[in-house]
Amino acid sequence: RNDYKDLIEMYEKNKKANKDQPQFFFNVTMQNHGGFSNNKVRFDEPVKITNFKAVQALDNYVSLMRTSDTALKDLIGYFKKVDEPVIILFYGDHQPSFSDDATKQLNEHSLYKSDNDKRLSKFVVPYFIWANYDIPEYDGMHDGGLTGEYNTVSVNYLASILLKYSGVELSDYDKYLLNLHQYIPAMSALGYWDGNGKRLFSTHITKPQASEFGAATRHKQKKVDEKKAEKLKRGYENVQYNLIFDAKDKLWDIFLPRKEDNK
C-alpha cells in the first residue's frame, strides 16, 4: 500500500513540474515475495484457510494477497479520477516459494499430477491491463481456460501488447513480436505453448512432447504450421542476440520507432 502511495506522489509531483510530458513508471514491489512463516504478523483483515488444515505460512500468504488486492483497488480508484489517459499493466513472474511443510500441503491439493506440470504451475500467473479510457476488454480470470487472443502470453510479449493498447506508434520489433505471438503464444525455459494453446515441454518445435497441462482449454483447434513456427523461433533467437549482445551491429532502426514517427 505504501508503495502505491509513493507512486501516486511521484505522479503528482512530476505532473506539477512537467504538465505536458507523459510519464512512465516501472514499479516493482516485493510485497508478497516471502517468507511467510512469521506467526507474529498482524493483519487488518486476516484470511484463514478452512477447507483443509493449513500451516501458518499459507494463512499469511492469502492474508497478504487480500491486503495487496485492497491496495490495488485503491490505486485504480485514484487513476480512474485523473484527467488524462492512464494505462496500467500488472503482472508477476512466478508463484511464491513456501516452506517444505506448506509445499507438501499444497501438493496434496494440487490440480496438477505430473512433476512437469507442477513445475510449470509455479510460473503461471495472472496479468491484466487496465485503462481509464476504452480499450478492448477480455477478462481471463472470469472466462477461464486459455481462451482469448492475449490470455496465453509470456513476459517477452507484454511490452508490445501494452504499447498496442496505449495507441502509440509501434516499432518494427513490436510488430514482429505481436506476429510471433500468433504462432508461439508463450515460451520459457520449460518449453512453450503452441498455436492451439497446448503446452509442449520439448524445446524442439518439430518434435514436441505434449503435456496435458493445456488439455482443458477451449481453443478452437487449428492447423499449426510447425515448419513456420520453427523458422520463427530460430529467427527470434537471432533477433534476441542482436538486441542484447551485438553492440557493434545493433539494428536500432528495428528496435526504436522510426524517426519520422517522433516528429
Predicted features along the sequence, with ranges:
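Solvent-exposed soluble domains appended to multi-pass membrane proteins
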Residues: 1-263
